[in-house]
Regions:
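Short acidic, Gly/Ser-rich segments with clustered Asp/Glu that frequently serve as metal-coordination loops
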Residues: 62-76
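N- or domain-start disorder-to-order transition segments that initiate the globular core
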Residues: 27-62
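A short acidic/glycine-rich loop-to-helix N-cap element
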Residues: 2-8
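Active-site-proximal helix-loop-helix substrate-binding element of RNase H-like nuclease domains
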Residues: 2, 13, 17, 23-41, ...
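A short linear-motif detector with a strong N-terminal bias
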Residues: 60-64, 106-107
Length: 221
């Protein structure tokens, strides 16, 4: 700590308040640390079908949707979505997009879901691309309503501290490093790709919960 360095002092005070807040909420701290232990995912066809059925039957449910794509440009015909993961923080399913494209597009247009994304702009563009390529009405798409990158930036605008790996380490104490090379994602083994995709959705869901809880605590105080 250096009180003469104004910027460092701001960082120290912010992190000190965070630490003291956690000390006063040991039960929540333990819950945070246990999040990584609760991660699991399914690629089972029966479980995926059942997952979709439950989402359509349960309204006002919050879920995270995460895409793995061959590139960033949703408007390029050379790039595409390869796989999709969906997580409600308890159960996570992941699949190759071509296996469930019709059901998934129906889900994107389902208005009773609160959809979380790492970056809503990115996921929105690819969602519209999927709907358009399937010959469906893009106007029926219901946009993502939660964006964790925007929330994390509002909480901490420093450069380099808002990527998913850092956020997972900071908030949950988990060293989360993807096991795939994103520059060669189209050639990755399917098993490794699906696990990576599932982790993204699961941790994004819980980061969003963390940010929402933080906002609620600030309103109370």
């Amino acid at each position: 700590r250096n009180p003469d360095d104004i910027e460092l002092e701001k960082i120290f005070l912010r992190d000190f308040r965070l630490a003291m807040n956690l000390i006063g909420q040991r039960d929540k701290l333990e819950a945070r640390l246990n999040i990584g232990k609760s991660f699991s995912y399914s690629t089972n066809r029966f479980e995926i079908q059942n997952y979709f059925n439950n989402l359509f039957n349960r309204r006002e449910k919050r879920i995270c949707i995460d895409y793995e794509t061959t590139g960033l440009n949703a408007y390029s015909n050379e790039e595409k979505v390869i796989s999709v993961a969906i997580s409600d923080g308890v159960s996570t399913v992941v699949f190759m997009i071509e296996d469930y494209i019709d059901l998934f597009i129906e889900l994107l247009c389902f208005s009773y879901l609160d959809k979380i994304a790492q970056s809503a702009g990115f996921e929105d563009k690819w969602s519209r691309r999927l709907i358009k390529d399937a010959g469906k009405d893009v106007g029926s798409f219901v946009p993502f309503s939660q964006d964790i990158l925007i929330k994390s930036f509002l909480l901490n605008g420093r450069v380099g501290v808002n990527n998913l790996e850092f956020l997972v380490w900071r908030y949950f104490g988990i060293e989360f490093k993807g096991e795939v090379d994103r520059t060669k994602i189209a050639r990755e083994a399917e098993g490794a790709l699906l696990k990576y995709n599932a982790q993204d959705a699961f941790y994004t869901y819980w980061l969003n919960e963390e940010f929402l809880n933080f906002a609620e605590r600030q309103l109370v105080h």
